């Protein structure tokens, strides 16, 4: 026995030495194997060797990932978790690999476990919030908090069961609430299907918590995959579903119900006879309504309304448009509409027409559903009753659950649904002014079971024809010509290049203040360079005969723009002269558009613009210096995401950028100041978590789905979010990208004193940014022209406050993620 123990000790010692040597030589796989052996033989050394083991595991896992050896990667993590079952760092790392390989449900489980093991882990928290947004979309909370919607569905289901429906199938059950309505109403047999693994597991928990397990059969599958009698014993008499989006058809209700009527439902009740067993659907029918609308906010996100930006002519060579109308092909996966809560759109909107009926849908008629799926088009003439700029169609629907109960999603209704918005893009860049008496002709179709509204023509009234000089389009022929000219290619020299931009990128292109501010800041740097050169010439002429003076340097400023997405800042910089600008655009379409614009603006002959995607990224994703030995004069960083959050790894990117600047070089912007305000907002509460059992009519759902709540609410328009300000604005955070030593987040937690200016209940901290390009020029992301949205952090527990109180807001900022907590100072 003594000999075996000594042999074991020698093996452990040799393996440990070998692991150390392997790590020095970056042989991470062998090092991991040696350490695994050591810890298996000597578990008492786990604590001492934990960091070394983690390092070798993570490095080896990265190599396995690069080699596409996913199974070996997961085997390593399973071995590691056997040794360290409660290690939050390993759990979090395992989740990261699962997420990047597409296993989001499984990743969520590991992130959640890591967060439970270490609630203060910023990495695990950020990862869990990110995956939670993927798995449980925010509309689940809004829908479950919609008491009226829940009451109407419950009443309609009760009526159906009282009228003889005995077998119920809930398609797309989500949390299972409709199934529980059916069971509580007395349905003998209730089945429910859900495709999402996370939602299915959540529904299982919820059904069990409400003492209905064994009474509701939950199926983890699409309804299209349900087989009789393998999954359910027979055809059902009632299908309940809420697979409808703002455009009604976007979640596939038409295809789903066509399949259900053919394979899962009893035959519908005949109109001229009475049968004991028949099939029906809740909702029974719907009417879609539409309206032509003027809306400046929609316009600036979906139509480029400027011909020149900070000295850069946009011209006619490039046609910018959003993805929504860029393609109508059979393989196009882009929804033909966006969605908005029209009652909350900044600046509001103006109705140019009365509401018109787009189409009616009978969900209890297989023939009606198949007609919709056929994609046949219907043309509707819409009279204009009020003059305005025609920007978009909006649609909403009235959902008839049964003969007695209905729901409406019209803009004036307080409902969980938004409205569908169809920006009109088949118009000249100047837009389209319509007058009272004109007629807008629209084609309505569902070629891929998505609702589409396409502008056909605008027929002018006689009074409008008399004012054609004031109109963008004089008659129907002009419009047809404009529509024909829209879809062009670059096959001919004079044709437009199509460049597809996201709505945020279009709003950025329309943001004149943004571009002019950067132009002014770059101009100041060029001016200071010219002053230095002038002083150099004077010194040289004083020191020697002017004929032998050294020539002025012809070196140009090297400006690197690493903005995300499409950016014309390199063109603006190059246009100023004495600048060689580098663009890091990634999409070929964007690069071609910038090249076209450089030709229009006479920047193509002197090599003022260069694309540096190949130079931009190192193995670590860091910016490199130019091809020449010269360092960067200006590096432009994209610091704030359009959604309203600080970009991930901003401080790390700024640190790399500082190392690549020439002496006197600058990072634009040089500083970011986060501004905040305490508010009371029931709306944000309802959009972020289920508010107890009352809105869900007594069912226990909130504790389960609220595990997936995320405190940061993004893409907000603070000017229209229903809220009550309870404090003045105050500085939350300051990030100096040029001088990191002056940043105020040096400690792990910052404590900010906030004075309460109004009594109420603090539910959230809204925030936005002042972006300081240089010491004198700044941008406000909350301004009316801003292309950035704002954000809010919803507090874990609302706090009642009194006017005149002083509270402490604890802010933790780490790795570009943030958490906040409101407390009262100790007396």
From Swiss-Prot:
Source organism superkingdom: Eukaryota
The answer, when asked if Repeat is one of the entry's keywords, is: yes
Name a biological process GO annotation.
regulation of DNA-templated transcription
Q: Which GO terms describe its cellular component?
A: cytoplasm; nucleus
Coarsely, its chief localization is cytoplasm
The record's TPR repeats, renumbered to this chain, cover 54-87, 88-121
Compartments where found: Cytoplasm
Keywords (alphabetical) are: Cytoplasm, Methyltransferase, Repeat, S-adenosyl-L-methionine, TPR repeat, Transferase
Q: What EC number(s) has UniProt assigned to this enzyme?
A: 2.1.1.320
The family database entries (Pfam families) matched by this protein are listed as: PrmA (PF06325), PRMT_C (PF22528)
Q: Which GO terms describe its molecular function?
A: histone methyltransferase activity; protein-arginine N-methyltransferase activity; protein-arginine omega-N symmetric methyltransferase activity
The record's function comment reads: Arginine methyltransferase that can both catalyze the formation of omega-N monomethylarginine (MMA) and symmetrical dimethylarginine (sDMA).
Can you name this protein? Protein arginine N-methyltransferase 9
Query: Which species does this protein come from?
Result: Xenopus laevis (African clawed frog)
Q: Source organism lineage?
A: Eukaryota, Metazoa, Chordata, Craniata, Vertebrata
Q: Which gene encodes it?
A: prmt9
